[in-house]
Amino acid sequence: SRYLKEKGVASMMWNWDSVEATQWLDRDIIWQMCGMPKNTQAEITAGRRMVNSVSFPYYLDLPYGWFNLRATYENTPEIPHIDAASAKNLLGLEAPLWTEYVPNMKKADYCTYPRLGAIAEIAWTAPENRSWAHFQQKLEDYYRLLSVYGVEHPATLKQAMPGALRAKGYSLWFNRRHLHWAGLHNLIDDAKVKKSVAKQQR
């Protein structure tokens, strides 16, 4: 991180719950928070900058059957308890699009929009000033704006707000990716990591 700092480049690291040995980490390293380690509050108060990557409803690649548009919009991101002076160190929210199973831009558009608009409003608007009903009223203009900027295949509101049966279908189709050896291997690795983290936290 010192080398990058000398070159004028900020370094960022993905931080899961198990990363507690912060005495070895330069405070200039930005944390991408996935999980909330016990030392989060102390670190951000001491000046470490962070990006909130905690909330699964903001993962753009997850199916609308898991988190529909309203569930994403009404989710309140988890943040550490910090004072107003330290709030500047919270740089924003992450809305990742993992592309292992996103074969083309049509699929990327479908996964990302209109969900990204909901996440942007969450990041920029205080909870008391957010309204799902008001957000819905703005969607028509939002779709027009997407078209102007070349987004050709956003999810329709019906696709982004599936009924129970359609939501189940979306989830089943998404989960089919685990029905091969590589997918099963990933599940096994995930279970091992969770077990290791739980053991360290005892």
Q: Which positions does each model-derived feature cover?
A:
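Aromatic-lined glycan-binding groove of carbohydrate-active enzymes
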Residues: 39-97
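Acidic/polar loop patches that form or flank catalytic/metal-binding clefts of enzymes
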Residues: 3-15, 50-54, 126-132, 154-155
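Active-site neighborhood of glycoside hydrolase catalytic domains
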Residues: 1-30, 34-48
